[in-house]
């Protein structure tokens, strides 16, 4: 029985890439800077001391980071026994966004440039806004700017509740985000508005990667909170991913846990499992791994590393999340059967010590574990697509156009 389990620690980069200067990210290092802060006692909120990741270290994380940066992460053990194969991978795609990273992991790099709304104020074309107001039967809109998702709620959440005007905002990513109150505006109405926005952006040729519904609750600034009912409307990948090939060519199964299905616009997904929060995502993953049959991929995105701690530049929170993940990692490892492979990776960086609130262009870790996987270094990988090609080879699908089999 062959099964592959792919775990994306969303935004867990391990050091700046060779082309980081194009993105203003030279010197960024999500893992290294978290470890450094922990070693200095600067991340002792809700946790204490050096970054403690013994299970990830056994899978080769510290070695992969050392390969990427040329140095051992502060306070971490570079001499621990390694029981998995490890690599550090460069992104071939032109961006440092979620769809690009995930599609490339599945063998389809994004070699075109996404569209962006680069103006920080009055970010969106008036023609687009007028269409949304008309088709969505809206009294108007708020925002129309670049912003952090949590900051904009404190600024405009109350006015939104009073007026019924949705909050439109964007970031350095190729996104159009809509924040609305779950109760006063309504979740279904928000989702409908996002569908309209997706249609208008696609038909208008804006080439925007994702429309994101950002529902929230609460009654006043300081109390507003985003809920787990986020929904991403992505464009479809430009070619068949390894997920699609497994389903089409081998009659296989692909189980999405978390936001994976949204990222791939449901292409190549046979089952969707929603869960919110690190523990709930882990619980759902364990359940799906236990139930997975032959020719199945269980694919989980652990979004909190990015959304709760990376973008919010919360080093202590990110460290605590990593340590929680590490404590629970043996639960996954013990479910890996004789012919199975477990792959732990990321989709980009989001260094919580970095300026601003955006992603960082970094190498990602590629940690591969299984009874038939030979432990040791797989070196520097030129594209995340090596993961997709490895999975294609493993299941015997037709090869991907990009990437090399690592095993």
Curated annotation (Swiss-Prot):
GO terms for biological process: 2-deoxyribose 1-phosphate catabolic process; 5-phosphoribose 1-diphosphate biosynthetic process; metabolic compound salvage; nucleotide metabolic process. It comes from the Bacteria. Keywords: Cytoplasm, Isomerase, Manganese, Metal-binding. Its main location: cytoplasm. Its EC number is 5.4.2.7. Its cofactor is Mn(2+). GO terms for cellular component: cytosol. One of its GO terms (molecular function) is manganese ion binding. Pathway: Carbohydrate degradation; 2-deoxy-D-ribose 1-phosphate degradation; D-glyceraldehyde 3-phosphate and acetaldehyde from 2-deoxy-alpha-D-ribose 1-phosphate: step 1/2. Isomerase that catalyzes the conversion of deoxy-ribose 1-phosphate (dRib-1-P) and ribose 1-phosphate (Rib-1-P) to deoxy-ribose 5-phosphate (dRib-5-P) and ribose 5-phosphate (Rib-5-P), respectively. This is Phosphopentomutase. It comes from Enterobacter sp. (strain 638).
